[in-house]
Amino acid sequence: DKDIKPYAEEVITKIKKSKCLLEINLEGQEGITLRTLEALFFNKKLITNNIKIKEYDFYNENNIYVINDKNISNETLIEIKTFLKLKKQKINDEILKKYTFEFWLKKVLNN
């Protein structure tokens, strides 16, 4: 059927139209996810519950908002509105390069 788009194509179309992406990690999940990489490489803001994301070299509070509460309060909603109005900061290309598939593949093959 020609009306059915491949999953990736549909996701990419939605990401391009979005100002910000939302990532909710499961309890115990650590590390960065595909959603984080999508935000980085499509130059989108990210709202996440991944507290450890602050430890990564690409973290910038203008670009990534970390939800600390399990229950979102009115204060959190105000903070998110403020975050969405902040100007997104460009991430250095050398930092981004470290999160490409090619870089990871070379790193794995060289170890």
State where each predicted segment sits.
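Non-catalytic N-terminal targeting/anchoring module and adjacent flexible stem/linker
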Residues: 110-111
